[in-house]
């Protein structure tokens, strides 16, 4: 008790001997620190998700589009290795070495923008892009500063893998396709865990400009970006030469795939009871498909 009182007296004496200016500065600094601690919302994303139903092995049985008309599967907790390697190589090479903001990337982007007299590079890290996706605000200088501040705060709260999962779950992939899982099924007809290197590379470059490069237009640009990324992966020895040759020979998908609708009545039921969530059933997808085919014939 005496020790606590002694410490309190020391703190009071410290403040008594401070000038008014120093007290004001200390108060401002304290408010800024408190503001920084609480500046990040507890929940970053406030968006509706698709209702997704899988079999007992996690295979997709069917899904219902989100209430805002987007194919946005519920957030995933992990990122497949191929996508992780592709994203970091393409978007943020120093992802594991910065605290949300990469000064080198910012400096390089500033130089390129001044040299070209227009914005050709943003210098945003994956953490900053995650904040941008969550805020969905106009891209201004002031907003960029806010993104940088919130990105550093997010780095204190979440692990690198959690941040990467947030990004891949909410990145735009063209049209009404949002997030890695929806994109994998819509563009390639299978789960993100089964993506090839070519497919992973295509999806890694797509959020960079989803309105300009996609399957219906800008296919040459999309293919060039994909192959350029694959070459970077080869140069970094992430993939070998035979894997590279096979990957660049893979064609782009022609058009989006329809999502599986193996158990539509079950999907409708979960849509009513567990809308916007993943629901794993005890059904075997292979058996369910066999029964459906036998029934329709």
Residue map of PLM features:
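Juxtamembrane regions of bacterial inner-membrane/periplasmic proteins
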Residues: 2-295
